[in-house]
Amino acid sequence: MIEKDISKPEDSFTFPRTGHISRNRSVLAAMTNKQSHKDGSISDQEIRWLNRRAEGGFGIVTTAAANVSEDGQGWEGEIGLYHDRQIENFRKLVSLVHNNGGLIFAQLFHGGMRAPELLTGKIPISASKIPFKDSSTGFTRAASLSDINRIIQDFSLAAERCVKAGLMELRFMEHMDT
């Protein structure tokens, strides 16, 4: 049994842990649009695209997946947060979205076995060595303990970059698969 009224989409929402308030419950999901620069920095075109969502009334805007490691890039035009030089354009995006009344979240990502060797120059990494047609060896590379610790550290450093850019919340995902 519901003990209180269900909120309406136009109602604001307060995040219990952080106290941040979204002006409404309309959330732009993370969508890949392949507009970022080759070095992973978010482009002015992508900044404009995301900011238009805030201008249009979304309470929360979520970035496309942002890779945390150079070897974790899953596709061309993907946002990166694996280097400090990528913070400034993120800061610009955050400022614009906030000025238009929205909150912005980043989706941090490592492509794992879905990070093509053609983009990264490295054999895709996975939880175990398995057949994989997009690898020059025909297999993924099994993640070592060192790899796992490095990727954890990469997520941590990317999260710190998000904080430096002023992002409010983070979402995490990876593709280590089998």
Language model features: what each stretch is:
Residues 52-53, 78, 83-86, 115-125, ...:
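Short alpha-helical interface elements
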Residues 69-73, 115-117, 178:
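Short acidic/His/Gly/Ser-rich catalytic and metal-binding motifs that mark active-site loops
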Residues 61-64, 104-108, 165-178:
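Short beta-strand segments at enzyme active-site cores
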Residues 33, 66-69, 131-133, 176-178:
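Short connector loops/turns at beta-strand edges and beta->alpha or beta->beta junctions
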Residues 1-109, 151:
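N-terminal capping/small domains of soluble enzymes
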Residues 95, 103, 109-167:
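Non-globular sequence segments
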